[in-house]
From Swiss-Prot:
Name of the gene: phlp-2
Keywords: Hydrolase, Leucine-rich repeat, Manganese, Metal-binding, Protein phosphatase, Repeat
Keyword hit for Repeat: yes
Enzyme Commission number(s) from the entry: 3.1.3.16
PROSITE patterns tied to this protein: LRR, PPM_2
GO molecular function: metal ion binding; protein serine/threonine phosphatase activity
Protein origin, superkingdom: Eukaryota
Residues that span the membrane, as ranges: none
Enzyme class (EC, first level): hydrolase
Protein's recorded name: Protein phosphatase PHLPP-like protein
């Protein structure tokens, strides 16, 4: 094409064939090197041939995701392709064409001619010649030098040196020309009398080269050493459409060649053999090749010329579009490894059986309906047959095969196998299998049968070492004889009520997983095992742990969310190797006695959400190796002990949602303490932590701390100080000594009243967990919220966060679906290989809008129930798997798409289009009186917590901030150590109002009989489990009020305190509490007053006292949340 023409058109768009019927648009076209571009105007009738004619090029090439190139046919309309592409991007789960989706489509089409769109979708004029970030150096180096050949005196000559491929050509002034083959020579630096020189020598001769520009020496040395030392060429991810010349000329004698993830093709049938070299077929010229990786290119047929490479040992042709294998493949006699996975094969030639040296053949993720007959004649160790259409295995008899991978096939309901030598069998994700009988496979060691419909599993135990049968319908397991060699048994997510008793007799069992069943007990002798190291039996119905009287080797015991009421006596003494114990969400009131006299290795202790009191504190402080303690949601009145300071390794302490009135001063003496959580207690002050050098997070929100008078000395490395929902305003001037540190500390102080948005109160909680990176971020701009989950990539989430914040500020009323797509388009180069889950929520006065793609989920509270409205895609179901396969993707053993990606719905991952799409879910919810709120969070919240748990937490706590924090506490109490982020929106109920009466109104306008029913109607208490006692004249000073628990109603609070009896007067006051018949679980509180005209002053004083005392007894935060209109 004409470069001058391209440069001239880049300044102003040109018009190419005015539209006839359809609307014209601008297209951006790139030069073949990708360095320049121009815009043209065209319509759907404009063809590639017409564009080529105008720009004097032979072809238009399309690139998606800055990855594969595709040459377009001459009669193709580029604009039509672009519109179809954008239409796919704007698709929603509903696939409905609405006015909003049309607007989103129009918006993204208007963005397509932006240079930033290059990373997603681009057209090139001619055949692309992109210079990628290459390890294959194609630069030609040329320098004026002085050279000396050999060791003779006075032989220095002026010359010009040219370095290209693996050669250095020396051109002297007398027109002598000599080429040096670098790969056959040793390269180093030599200190000569004339200066530093590049020395090249072999067995016969030595060359010294001194550069006139001395600083050039290092560049030439590096380049020469790269050429010299390796016969391995890595040209992967180079955006190659042709193989570079320096590879094909075989000067390097390349043995290992990596051409993965390019756009290489075989020579088209119409291409003449005299055409330029560079096709896959031309690799036969490189006779030295032993290993070739051509995976993830655009090969349509098996390159038959490769069968001429007599030294070839390994050939990888996976993730191409090959539909047949030629019989000539039998010529590759030395071939040991052949990977043909993720192609379009349905048969293999019988001649493959002649490859007697073949050790590995991978034909997974093709279209085989039966096992190719040639496999029965090969001496392979493993059959890799995952992702095909195989229904059964017909062939029986003795065979050498030992391992078979049959994942994601269509195997029949009853599975049997008669190949006796099998040692490893993988049947995962065959959704029709209900029965597996393999008692005849006496050599079977490892079996994977997860995610089937298994109701019956029978195995031989003679050689069995590992059994994985999670996510099935099993209530029993038959293994005969006793599996003496069994090491791992995983049976989670089944229907077991009791585990087999023979488990206790397995002498080598080290790992047992049986969570998410219906277990009522563990095997009686399970703790007598001397080999068992880990037991995971959480989310069951276990009521007790069997007694055991001798020490064992157990290191991990996870039993959260069961029905335990106690632990065995001497539990900690006879488990000396226990390092992690989780008994959260049980009914335990007291930990068993432990005096510290015996050695205890326990490092992680999680006892959240039980009935523990301060009586268990002496037990805990005797465990000197503890690093994490979680005692949240218990009944602790204090956490103090004289030995508390001996927990020198403690890093994380959670005391939230207890009854604490103070924190022990000795907590500041713990040298390793990093995180302290004590929210939702009754604390009135924060102790001195100035000397805690490691402490970076303190959460004392939702307490009774008076922030206006708080004298807080901040530790030097404090980053987060959360004082939300306390009284007063926190003033950092109270600790001026730490002024230099304040710029690093994030003080969080959000009053609930300030977080009011169209009748919703807002609660937010987030944590990095045990990770150093924050990969989940949240954005709020006015009435719009954004959630970004970058998976394991913190840079991606922060990049999207910055863009979304700035974009929302400029386009606050833009449709949230269009915003989501703009985030997709703005990822740029990072979006080619990386992606993120994004959810956007917009709150209106009368409706809620939610748009989401990825793993974020949301549930709405309506009529005392929580219902999922957007469910993030955690697992790949059958329908989604079919779509992925149609898009030429595959799924690995861990259900990761193309071996990397966790979800097929994300923004980003441009290079995997159309396997991964930004397809979104959209909900438009009309607000009414039945809707109570919304919970939004990342996927692990919904994976680990049940909808019932979340519903209970939401409806048993009136503060959305407390709800968010308790959800986070519960998540961490279940051993989740990753990032979490939670948003809670809660509808505000009408304020409780006490209508008192001024003197004038009492005397002149209102009578008590009229006022009393009015008070009854307006005062509604939204705390269902709280019952106020009757008022008595002189009650004692009350003890701390217990925190409200979601498991059982809290005991009633003590009587309202009063320091002196009320004055005797003609006014009488009575507080009556009666259950409301109109509100579910609510109570109506009425204050009945009888006034006389002579007691105005005393009645006002009495009213003020009653108001303050009632607010304090109700634990309202801040105390003046209840308003009194006097």
């Amino acid at each position: 094409m004409n470069n001058e023409q391209l440069q001239s058109t880049s300044s102003s768009p040109s018009t190419l064939l005015k539209p006839i019927e359809k609307k014209s648009r601008f297209l951006r076209l790139y030069s073949s090197d990708g360095q320049r571009s121009t815009r043209i105007e065209c319509d759907e009738h404009t063809t590639c041939a017409q564009i080529c004619q105008q720009f004097s090029c032979d072809v238009i090439t399309l690139q998606i995701g800055n990855y594969h190139f595709r040459q377009l046919k001459s009669d193709t309309s580029p604009l039509a392709i672009l519109q179809d592409f954008c239409r796919i991007l704007t698709m929603s789960d509903e696939n409905l064409e609405t006015e909003s989706t049309s607007k989103a489509l129009e918006d993204i089409l208007s963005y397509t001619d932006s240079p930033a769109f290059r990373h997603i979708f681009s057209f090139f004029l001619g055949r692309p010649r992109i210079r990628a970030k290459s390890t294959l150096n194609l630069d030609i180096l040329s320098e004026e030098v002085v050279i000396r050949k050999g060791k003779l005196i006075h032989t220095w000559q002026n010359a010009r040196a040219v370095f290209y491929n693996s050669n250095i050509r020396l051109q002297t002034k007398n027109n002598q020309d000599e080429a040096l083959q670098i790969r056959n020579m040793k390269v180093d630096v030599h200190e000569s009398k004339r200066g530093r020189a590049l020395r090249l020598k072999d067995d016969d001769v030595c060359y010294l080269i001194i550069f006139q520009r001395p600083n050039i020496l290092e560049a030439w040395l590096t380049r020469a050493q790269q050429v010299e030392k390796s016969n391995h060429v890595d040209a992967s991810d180079e955006q190659l459409t042709l193989i570079p010349e320096q590879i094909l000329n075989n000067e390097a004698r390349v043995q290992i060649l990596n051409l993965r993830r390019n756009s290489l093709i075989s020579r088209p049938p119409t291409e003449k053999s005299m055409a330029p070299l560079g096709y896959i077929d031309d690799l036969y010229r490189v006779h030295s090749l032993q290993v070739i990786d051509l995976s993830a290119n655009q090969i349509l047929s098996f390159p038959i010329q490769l069968t001429l490479l007599s030294h070839l040992r390994q050939l990888n042709l996976s993730s191409n579009y090959i539909s047949s294998v030629p019989s000539e493949c039998s010529n590759m006699r030395r071939l040991q490894y052949l990977n043909l996975s993720n192609n379009q094969l349905d048969t293999l030639p019988d001649s493959i059986s002649e490859l007697q040296n073949l050790q590995s053949l991978d034909i997974s993720f093709n279209q085989f309906s039966q096992i190719p007959p040639c496999l029965f004649h090969l001496t392979l160790e493993m059959w890799r047959l995952a992702g095909n259409n195989i229904e059964k295995i017909d062939r029986v008899g003795e065979m050498q095969i030992q391992k078979i991978d049959l994942r994601r096939n269509v195997l029949d309901t009853s599975f049997r196998l008669d190949i006796e030598n099998i040692t490893h069998l993988d049947l995962r994700d065959n959704s029709m299998i209900s029965t597996v009988h393999l008692t005849n496979l006496r050599f079977l060691k490892v079996i994977h049968c997860e995610r089937l419909q298994l109701s019956s599993l029978h195995l031989s135990g003679e050689s069995l070492t590992h059994v994985y049968a999670d996510h099935n319908l099993l209530d029993s397991l038959v293994v005969m004889p006793l599996p003496q060699n069994l090491q791992t048994l995983s049976l989670s997510f089944n229907h077991f009520r009791n585990l087999p008793d023979w488990i206790s007799d397995c002498p080598n069992l080290t790992f047992l997983r049986a969570n998410n069943n219906s277990l009522v007990a563990l095997p009686e002798r399970i703790f007598y095992s001397q080999s068992l190291r880990s037991i995971f039996a959480f989310i069951n119905e276990i009521e007790h742990i069997p007694d055991f009287g001798e020490e064992n080797c157990l290191e991990t015991l996870i039993l959260y969310k069961n029905k335990l009421s106690s632990l065995p006596k001497h539990f900690f003494s006879i488990l000396p190797r226990l390092r992690q114990l989780n008994i959260s969400s049980n009914f335990i009131e007291l930990l068993p006695y432990f005096d510290g006299s015996s050695f205890c290795r326990l490092q992680i202790l999680r006892c959240a959400n039980n009935y523990l009191t301060e009586n268990s504190v002496p037990v805990i402080v005797n465990m000197k190796h503890l690093k994490i303690i979680d005692l949240s949601h218990n009944r602790l009145n204090s956490f103090d002990d004289s030995a508390l300071s001996s927990l020198e390794l403690l890093e994380d302490l959670n005391l939230s949602s207890n009854r604490l009135t103070r924190l022990a001063d000795c907590l500041a003496l713990l040298p390793c303490l990093q995180v302290l959580r004590a929210h939702s207690n009754q604390l009135v002050h924060v102790p001195e932590f100035r000397a805690s050098n490691q402490l970076h997070t303190i959460d004392v929100s939702s307490n009774n701390i008076s922030l206006g008078t708080l004298q807080f000395k901040a530790p030097p490395n404090l980053r987060h100080f959360d004082v939300t929902c306390n009284s007063g305003d926190f003033d950092t001037e109270n600790f001026p000594e730490n002024a230099k540190m304040h710029s690093k500390m994030n003080t969080i102080n959000i009053s609930e009243g300030s977080q009011n948005l169209f009748g919703f109160q807002i609660g937010v909680s987030g944590s990095r967990g045990m990770k150093n990176k924050q990969c989940i971020r949240q954005v709020r701009v006015e009435n719009t919220f954004g959630f970004i989950d970058g998976g394991s990539n913190s840079y991606m989430s922060s990049s999207i966060c910055r863009f979304m914040t700035s974009y929302l500020k400029e386009n606050v009323s833009m449709d949230i679906r269009s915003i989501l797509l703009r985030c997709h388009c703005e990822l740029g180069e990072e979006g080619e290989r990386l992606g993120a889950s994004v959810m956007i929520i917009r709150v209106h006065e009368k409706r809620l809008e939610i748009a989401s793609t990825g793993t974020m989920s949301a549930a709405i509270a309506r009529n005392q129930k929580l219902k999922m409205i957007i469910n993030g895609r955690y697992e790949i179901d059958d329908d989604e798997y079919s779509r992925i396969r149609e898009a030429h993707g595959f799924v690995d053993e861990e259900n990761r798409i193309n071996g990397v990606i966790g979800s097929s719905r994300q923004i980003g991952h441009f290079s995997t289009f159309p396997v991964v799409l930004p397809t979104h879910s959209y909900r438009n919810i009309q607000l009414n009186e039945q809707i109570e709120g919304l919970i939004v969070g990342n996927n692990m919240i919904w994976n680990m917590l049940s909808i019932d748990d979340l519903n209970s937490t939401f409806h048993n706590n009136r503060s959305p901030i407390v709800v968010a924090k308790k959800i986070q506490d519960q998540l961490q109490s279940y051993d989740y150590g990753g990032n979490s982020n939670i948003l809670v929106l809660r509808r505000i109920k009408p304020q409780m109002t006490f209508n008192g009466f001024s003197t004038s109104s009492t005397k002149n306008q209102v009578t008590p009989d009229i006022a009393i029913p009015k008070i009854d109607e307006q005062l509604v208490l939204a705390v269902p489990a709280l019952i106020l006692p009757e008022y008595h004249p002189s009650p004692p000073v009350p003890p701390p009020i217990p925190a409200i628990r979601h498991r059982t109603p809290s005991p009633p609070p003590p009587p309202l305190p009063s320091s002196t009896p009320p004055p005797v007067s003609s006014e009488h006051e009575e507080i009556n509490v009666r259950q409301s018949s109109t509100l579910s679980g609510g109570y109506t509180l009425s204050i009945d007053r009888f006034y006389s005209s002579s007691s105005t002053v005393s009645s006002r004083k009495q009213f003020n006292e009653t108001r303050d005392l009632l607010s304090k007894s109700l634990k309202l935060s801040p105390p003046n949340t209840v308003t009194f209109n006097i």
